[in-house]
Amino acid sequence: KCGFGLTGIIFSAKLQIFKIKSTCITVKHQNVKNLIDCYRLIKNSKYLYNQNTFVVDYSKNNIFLGRVFFGFFSKKEFNFRKIKDNEIYNLRLGLFNLNFIKISIYKISFLIEKLINIFSNKKHINDILFTSNKKTIYFNLMPNKFIEYQNIVPEKKVDNYLKEFERIIVKHKPKITLIHLKKFNENGKNFEFKKRGLAIAIHIVIDENFNAFYKDLTNLDLKNKCIINFYKNSLADLEFLKKVYPTYSKKFIKNIKKINKRYKFSNSIFKNYF
């Protein structure tokens, strides 16, 4: 009863070897028991790989192994694999030997990433570990009735939100195929609001348990003044929009009416490959 999406069609692949002293980066496993522990782990870690996902299931004993984080909600057993920054004592660049006196990565937070960029032609560590990241097409293999729900929970309300979120999952037992948690920090330059907190993405199958769960979920978001991603939520109506974005709803509705209904989506990838 637990499905999950498949990401990627690899058109080309290239093997890359990346070498850096083992004293700089280590991998550490850490177990957590609930969503609040997940949030605190994300919030307090200097560097976590960007995809932290797990599968929710109530009937199977299978383990879904992701890139970083795997486990089942019903068992309350999850495992993070995180990248840990250590202290640099010695670094070799070609024929030169540069000695550092216990330079702390914690104090110089971007040093490791800059060094990685130097050695890998300005590529991020995610692209080093998974070289096909930028050569993929995302598609889902979920059931026909399926939506993705995204929101941003304000920082001060995260703990209470996650407790209630777990409660309504246990209460309604929806088919959730993926939950994505990500620390959110925006200063307002790219958005018309300023928020710090937790960004959540949920893949939900629309079945007999969906309506009751969705109603409680949207009420929970309104209660905690969460920001909803209406681009992803195809079920949201204008009344819900007005409650979430009271300041911008009139402007949004006005511009929606200007959209040309005859416009059809087109993409060069589909023209070339399908």
What residue ranges belong to the model's regions?
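Short amphipathic alpha-helices in soluble, non-transmembrane regions
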Residues: K163-I168, F213-D221
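A common structural junction motif
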Residues: I169-T177, N219-I228
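C-terminal structural cap/anchor segments
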Residues: N151-I204
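N-terminal flexible segment immediately upstream of the FAD-binding catalytic core
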Residues: I128-I147, I179-L198, K264-F274
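C-terminal substrate-binding/cap subdomain adjacent to the FAD-binding core in PCMH-type
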Residues: K1-R167, K175
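A generic structural motif
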Residues: V55-V56, K84, I176-K183, I228-L235
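Activity-critical C-terminal alpha-helical subdomain
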Residues: N209, C226-F274
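Short glycine/threonine-rich loop-to-helix capping motif typified by GTGT followed
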Residues: F64-S74, N121-N126, E186-G197, E239-S249
